[in-house]
């Protein structure tokens, strides 16, 4: 279950626990009052701390969401927020760079020249610092934005990256359903995503590369059979010529990404490198382009 710090109280935590919820994810974003004010959040740093402490009274499985790349956020402010999440007992931490959405106050401020666009180099440095702090504290990075102590990886997150169907309940919630030939995402009664089999295969490769374990040679071969119309056998790393088609070669795409240092191949799997995660748009875009 997800909650914001300003709405989470100790009695609510007890009630949620009694209902059978086994994990709480808190949208903290920062433990710095100035940064929270810039974001326009309804909670302050002390409320965030209180929410994490309240959650830990009942839940062992507590996750904290943090953001980097926020205007006015110093490197030390962000690093201290990561350290504080660990100190408060979170066993799962997700770190996201600020995304400027169209028609938002930040977007308007940038258009007026009142604010600079997020610095991608600064965001990358912040993500690397978060990784260092969390790994030193015993966390491991199991997917692009999330770190967990062993046994506390999010099954919810993993379901997205492994193509598991899901049901969304409530306003703006998204449902994903699929069969062998079609994948659809539906929001508020409207189809917002409708993929054919080739696009599904490309998306599965892209989603798989959001996880540390990446994708196996067997997964790549199966995707190639669908995307390039090439039936392949076994799970070995096949020659690029076997996958060539007018739409591009699946294995050639991975080889190109490897040449760029964005992926690596070992032990029968293709995995993203740290550089690949930092350059996610290039990595994911190349795989999605296999079946536009």
Mark where each language-model region is.
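Solvent-exposed, charged/polar functional surfaces in cytosolic regulatory/catalytic domains
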Residues: 133, 256, 286
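Basic amphipathic alpha-helical segments that dock to polyanions
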Residues: 249-260
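A short, conserved structural fragment
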Residues: 258-268
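Minor-groove-contacting beta-hairpin "wing" of winged helix-turn-helix DNA-binding domains
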Residues: 269-273
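Short, amphipathic alpha-helical interaction segments positioned at domain boundaries
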Residues: 275-292
């Amino acid at each position: 279950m997800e909650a914001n710090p300003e709405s989470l109280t100790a009695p609510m935590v007890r009630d949620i626990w009694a209902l059978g919820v086994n994990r709480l994810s808190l949208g903290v974003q920062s433990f710095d009052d100035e940064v929270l004010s810039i974001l326009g959040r309804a909670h302050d740093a002390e409320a965030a701390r209180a929410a994490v402490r309240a959650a830990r009274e009942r839940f062992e499985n507590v996750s904290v969401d943090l953001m980097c790349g926020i205007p006015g956020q110093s490197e030390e402010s962000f690093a201290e927020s990561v350290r504080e999440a660990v100190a408060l007992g979170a066993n799962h931490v997700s770190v996201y760079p600020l995304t400027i959405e169209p028609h938002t106050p930040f977007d308007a401020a940038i258009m007026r020249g009142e604010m600079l666009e997020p610095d991608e180099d600064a965001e990358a440095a912040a993500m690397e610092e978060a990784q260092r702090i969390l790994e030193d504290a015993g966390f491991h990075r199991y997917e692009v934005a999330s770190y967990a102590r062993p046994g506390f990886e999010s099954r919810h997150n993993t379901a997205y990256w492994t193509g598991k169907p899901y049901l969304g309940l409530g306003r703006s919630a998204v449902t994903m359903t699929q069969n062998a030939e079609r994948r659809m995402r539906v929001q508020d009664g409207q189809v917002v995503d409708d993929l054919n089999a080739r696009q599904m295969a490309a998306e599965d490769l892209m989603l798989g590369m959001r996880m540390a374990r990446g994708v196996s040679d067997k997964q790549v071969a199966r995707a190639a059979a669908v995307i390039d119309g090439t039936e392949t056998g076994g799970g070995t790393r096949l020659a690029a010529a076997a996958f060539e088609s007018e739409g591009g070669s699946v294995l050639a795409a991975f080889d190109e990404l490897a040449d760029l240092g964005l992926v690596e191949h070992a032990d029968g799997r293709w995995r993203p490198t740290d550089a690949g995660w930092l350059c996610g748009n290039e990595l994911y875009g190349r795989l999605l382009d296999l079946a536009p």
